[in-house]
């Protein structure tokens, strides 16, 4: 905002899909599949989906060794949980199944917070839980299994993609997120201490 002192931002946070025009929103940030095929969309980035749980939960329930072991665990379903239909790939091996959630939270931050509190295992975009992984509040599970990616897109309200302020905001976000996004690495997994940078 220091570069654009006249810029005004009205930030609305939530995982609900509002009508952008009715809400007076120029641009929205959306994770995952988009339902409005008429919207103007610009991809910002894609994060891998990861499974994570707290050490307290894992001390109590044990760690899953394969995706099918998840059936024996408390699952927290959040917005990145794909309605509980999870798919994993490891080399030539693929598995897909429906999981039952013990807890469903429709806000990403709430689902991550529930996992930090030891309520179960959550599937979430890596970028959404990176801090918790780095601080050791969460441990990444089954890192050798690919659970797909979640895209972050900028969705412009009808007729507002041409607004210079909306374009400048999205350009800034893309530059800032790609500048601060570390290269893909392996956050702490079972048996590892979290690696922190100074």
What are these regions (language model features)?
Residues 1-40, 186-198:
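Central regulatory/effector-binding core of bacterial HTH transcription factors
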Residues 26-28, 50, 75-76, 122:
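Short, well-ordered beta-strand core segments
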Residues 6-10, 93-102:
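A local structural motif
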Residues 1, 85-98:
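Ligand-binding cleft/hinge of the Venus flytrap
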Residues 38-49, 53-76, 91:
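Flexible hinge/capping segments at coil-to-helix
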């Amino acid at each position: 905002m220091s570069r654009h002192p006249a810029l005004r931002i009205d930030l609305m946070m939530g995982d609900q899909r509002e009508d952008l025009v009715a809400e007076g929103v120029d641009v929205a940030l959306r994770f995952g599949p988009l339902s409005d095929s008429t919207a103007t969309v610009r991809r910002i980035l894609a994060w891998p989906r990861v499974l994570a749980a707290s050490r307290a939960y894992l001390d109590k329930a044990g760690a899953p060794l394969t995706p099918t072991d998840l059936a024996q665990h408390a699952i927290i379903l959040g917005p990145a949980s794909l309605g509980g239909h999870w798919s994993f790939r490891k080399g030539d091996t693929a598995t897909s199944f429906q999981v039952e959630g013990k807890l469903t939270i429709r806000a990403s931050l709430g689902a991550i917070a529930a996992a930090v509190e030891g309520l179960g295992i959550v599937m979430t975009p890596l970028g959404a839980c990176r801090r918790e992984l780095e601080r050791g509040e969460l441990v990444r599970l089954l890192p050798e299994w690919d659970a797909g990616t979640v895209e972050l897109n900028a969705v412009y309200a009808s007729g507002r993609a041409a607004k210079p302020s909306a374009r400048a905001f999205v350009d800034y976000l893309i530059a800032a997120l790609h500048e601060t996004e570390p290269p893909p690495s392996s956050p702490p997994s079972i048996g590892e201490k979290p690696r922190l940078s100074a």
